[in-house]
């Protein structure tokens, strides 16, 4: 018989740098999960990623207090800021541009994000990411969406 799922917790954690401090401790502690065990498993699973990369993680908690987790790709905004080498997006994206990325960088981000999207069409993923870039004030050189 399959384990009974009791809760699902979604967190955004830095790769390889999770600690039992908030937000991990309180989020998992209230469900009776061994927090250190999760921290060790998460840090081991994310050790190959660049340190500090924000990683969304979905933790499934079962009735017997065991858990499984799925790591997703970093948020699109994080990848765009990293590619454009900016700290944050523009507060007024129509008038003020925060930075620029190339068409190749857009394609790389789209290929990385494709597995988390609800489509496998790379052009559709690129359009979605271009829309996010536009709303952040990041210009894409050579892209006519």
Curated annotation (Swiss-Prot):
Q: Which CDD domains match?
A: Ribosomal_L11
Decide whether keyword Iron-sulfur is in the record.
no
Q: How is it modified after translation?
A: One or more lysine residues are methylated.
One Pfam annotation reads Ribosomal_L11_N
Q: Which domain of life is it from?
A: Bacteria
InterPro entries with a match to the protein in the record: Ribosomal_uL11, Ribosomal_uL11_bac-typ, Ribosomal_uL11_C, Ribosomal_uL11_C_sf, Ribosomal_uL11_CS, Ribosomal_uL11_N, Ribosomal_uL11_N_sf
Output the PANTHER family linked to this UniProt entry: 60S RIBOSOMAL PROTEIN L12, LARGE RIBOSOMAL SUBUNIT PROTEIN UL11M
What is the protein's quaternary organization? Answer: Part of the ribosomal stalk of the 50S ribosomal subunit. Interacts with L10 and the large rRNA to form the base of the stalk. L10 forms an elongated spine to which L12 dimers bind in a sequential fashion forming a multimeric L10(L12)X complex.
Family designation: Belongs to the universal ribosomal protein uL11 family.
- This protein is called Large ribosomal subunit protein uL11
Source organism of this protein record? Hydrogenobaculum sp. (strain Y04AAS1)
């Amino acid at each position: 018989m399959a384990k009974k799922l009791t809760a699902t917790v979604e967190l955004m954690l830095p790769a390889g740098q999770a600690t039992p401090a908030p937000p991990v401790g309180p989020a998992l502690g209230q469900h009776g999960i061994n927090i250190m065990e999760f921290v060790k498993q998460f840090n081991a699973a994310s050790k190959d990623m660049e340190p500090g990369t924000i990683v969304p993680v979905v933790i499934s908690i079962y009735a017997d207090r065991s858990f499984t987790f799925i790591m997703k790709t970093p948020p699109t905004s994080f990848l765009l800021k990293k590619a454009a080498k900016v700290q944050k997006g523009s507060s007024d994206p129509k008038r003020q541009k925060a930075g620029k990325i190339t068409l190749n960088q857009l394609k790389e981000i789209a290929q990385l994000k494709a597995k988390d999207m609800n489509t496998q069409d790379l052009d559709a993923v690129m359009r979605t990411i271009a829309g996010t870039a536009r709303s952040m004030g990041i210009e894409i050189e050579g892209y006519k969406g």
